[in-house]
Every structure is written in C-alpha cells, then in structure tokens.
Amino acid sequence: MSNQRIRIRLKAFDHRLIDQSTAEIVDTAKRTGAQVRGPIPLPTRKERYTILTSPHVNKDARDQYEIRTHKRMIDIVEPTEKTVDALMRLDLAAGVDVQISLG
C-alpha cells in the first residue's frame, strides 16, 4: 500500500465536532506510522433563509436563519495496513459526515 493515498473529507454543522474528529484521525494515522497532510480547512458553506413571520400582511416582518457547513480534508500519503485497520475501527461523532477515497 505504499503507492496509494487515502483522502478523507469531513463535513459537519458544528466546527467543534469536526475539529475533534480530524484530531482523532490525524492522531490515529500518525500513531500507526503513516504520513499525514492536513487537516486542510475547506471553504465553509453558508446557507441563508429568509421567512415571513406573518402569514398575511406585514411584509417587513421577517426572520432570517443561517446554517453553516464546515468542511475539512485530510490526506494520508503512505498508509500501512495498521493505518487502514485503525481507521476502520475508529468511532467518530454522530454529527460528522465522512467520505473516504483511495487514490
């Protein structure tokens, strides 16, 4: 597995959860002897919604909501067999979406 690269992309609404998960992944990969690049912070996506508070009149009365999607990317350059096994057994927070690709 010396020629391969593992790219891990993480998404979460809470930046504390995603930072904690990236720290766990980097610590696990370094402990097993792999070379790690990252975590690389990717642009945060901000979705804003404006909703009328009144069902009939008062067009000026509105509520605004925002949801932020935080993203991070980690490259594991030289993974070993122990690295892959440790990453498969790793238990991350429930609010973090993990995408793993081999390249």
UniProtKB/Swiss-Prot annotation:
Coiled coil: none annotated. GO terms for molecular function: structural constituent of ribosome; tRNA binding. The keyword Ribonucleoprotein applies. Involved in the binding of tRNA to the ribosomes. This is Small ribosomal subunit protein uS10. Keywords: Ribonucleoprotein, Ribosomal protein. GO terms for biological process: translation. It comes from Colwellia psychrerythraea (strain 34H / ATCC BAA-681). Part of the 30S ribosomal subunit. It comes from the Bacteria. The gene is rpsJ. The keyword Ribonucleoprotein applies. Belongs to the universal ribosomal protein uS10 family. Gene3D superfamilies: Ribosomal protein S10 domain (3.30.70.600). GO terms for cellular component: ribonucleoprotein complex; ribosome.
